[in-house]
Amino acid sequence: MRRSDREITDPGEILSIINDCKVIHLAMVDDGEPYLLPLNFGYACESGAFSFFCHSAREGRKLDILRKNPTVAFEMDCRGALDEHDVACHCGYYFASVTGVGHVEFLDGEEKLVALTSLMRHMASREDQFTEQQAHAVEVFAIRADKLSAKAKVPHSAQ
């Protein structure tokens, strides 16, 4: 990371950033062509390994691509605000972000139910429980982060 002064390595702060983000941007490759989508997500962190859970219709281009090539990149960001100055060239933007690469695994059974509950917990602060019938109506996949980094530019008063 070029700007090491902005790198976030504290696991608690990384979790805080992830919790503040509501959209993960998922990048994949379809026969040499990049394809990028914004998705809502839930997440889990077990022994320092992050998984991000997404749901989808049971068919479509995204799923076709992921089944052929499960390698992905992802990005999420939050806490955005303009760092305004009188001179335009001195303006900037405050942010917090998490980026990484990983692979997709399609979920079923209990793992799928847990992922859907995680998604609702993150997006709506609810502890919904899902039935097998409800879960059957959607496809659910986990983005398993193989590499992950976090970065932030915060106002001086917040440092």
Please name every model-derived segment.
Residues 1-20:
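Extreme N-terminal tail/first-helix region
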Residues 2-3, 79-159:
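Charged, gly/pro-rich active-site loop segments
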Residues 17-18, 65-66, 119:
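A generic structural signal for nonpolar/aromatic side chains embedded in well-ordered alpha-helices
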Residues 19-21, 69, 135-138:
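Short gly/pro-enriched beta-turn/loop segments at secondary-structure junctions
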Residues 21-58, 74:
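Short beta-strand segments
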Residues 23, 36-38, 71, 95, ...:
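Broad gene-expression machinery/nucleic-acid interaction feature
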